[in-house]
């Protein structure tokens, strides 16, 4: 019955059969991405409601168009505890993982390339976090000097990376291999098909990278700098759906103010953060989540204390009312 209803709805809405609809999706990665994004929002809403939260969808484009979009409502949902009467909400943004992280531009099409990626994560150099922090600060300083040269007397936002978790990569692969030679032997023993796009798409390649993808051209409110990434202040909590790498619509959460911002524009986030790397047959298929990422929404809010916002009625999506 459900299948017949789906077939009828697709025929009425799109004028095609179910198989034609699916073929169109397969041949249009962008369309597939939009549907996955919509599903992520659907499952995130259900997840939060099951945990005792009131969830109100934020309209993508309010009456009046983009000019009427509030800077305080740049996410997908307003969220607060069920039963609360306080006008105090957290704006939640839902995103998915980058679908082509492993194979775009033939990134990991042989074991040598994968080795160069994994070695620094499996055998980090002593003081590497300090080194990453310093490199980020050097980039920041250069960007600040260049910006102030054209904006005399104006203030460039401060550099606010966390020294404990600097940069966009948060995973730790130490202990999986005895030494670099052991890693080399492991990777070189894998069959060639482990480094193909097909294997990576099916999550059975040499690695599965949990990398965020947040393309969103935004201009900084203070600097006017434009980057293809969200602003740190756009939302209160970022929720990432891990489906593309774990096969389940499950979420991890982060406070954007706890993530390392773009080193060249402190008002922006990075477009991509690496949450973890799964190694088939070597590391359990479950991701290991560590700060600034959290497995639970409640845990993220409790430990990072994001700032609450007032609900703006003009930003609420009433389509389902």
What positions do the PLM features span?
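Conserved hydrophobic/aromatic positions in well-ordered beta-strands
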Residues: 78, 239-241, 252
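Interdomain/boundary linker segments immediately adjacent to catalytic/signaling cores
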Residues: 1-56, 60-70, 81-83, 102-104, ...
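A short catalytic or substrate-binding loop motif that flags glycine-/basic-rich loops and adjacent residues
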Residues: 68-72, 231-232
